[in-house]
Amino acid sequence: MKTLKEKFGELSARIKASGQPARAWFPQYTPASLLNAENWWEALAVCEYALDTKEDEKLTEDFFELIFSAFDCNVEVDLNAEEYEFWWEKVMQVCDRVAEFSGAGWAQKGAQYSEARYGKRDMSYLFPYYEKAADMGWAEAEATVAYWRYMGFYCEQDKEEGERRFAALTSPEAILWGK
């Protein structure tokens, strides 16, 4: 029986051998299809391929956000410790690569640490990684960090700083947070 790492390697090789650009793969993945673990793993391999081939950053960011819109939980929940280790390393690598151009990578990395298993959970990463995402202009993190600062969640409370950050928000997320 093949290991998860071997199966993922085969998926990656098949995607690369297709000769199609990553953007051609993106539309076939939907929230419904990503509930299936095999589809999610394939989508992660497509995301890596997009990063390897320098696909358009906005398209890659949007695809990354889609595959990590809670669908990763369906994949990792049944993994044993060895499989989880591979999953963790792969997810962290992809988050790091996306974080080079998008705050979405930093925010997802922080979220992964806050939800991790097998001794990897570490809440101390959540706020700093979200703050990096906010500093990169990732709208969801900008609003979240403002709120956390104001309330003192995951960081030292600083109402003044929270209010300053709220006042600077211009995104639709700011409206959701009650600006």
Which functions belong to the PLM regions below?
Residues A37, E76-E85, E100, R117-D122, ...:
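Short coil/turn and helix-start
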Residues A50, V98, K132-A133, L169:
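Canonical positions in the second alpha-helix
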Residues Y29, L66-E76, W106-E115, T144-M151:
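Hydrophobic face of amphipathic alpha-helices that form TPR/SEL1-like repeat modules
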Residues E160-E173:
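TPR/TPR-like (Sel1-like) alpha-helical repeat modules
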Residues E55-D56, N74, E100-G103, E115-R117, ...:
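Short helix-capping/linker turns of helical repeat alpha-solenoids
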Residues F26, L59-L66, G105, A141:
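The tetratricopeptide repeat
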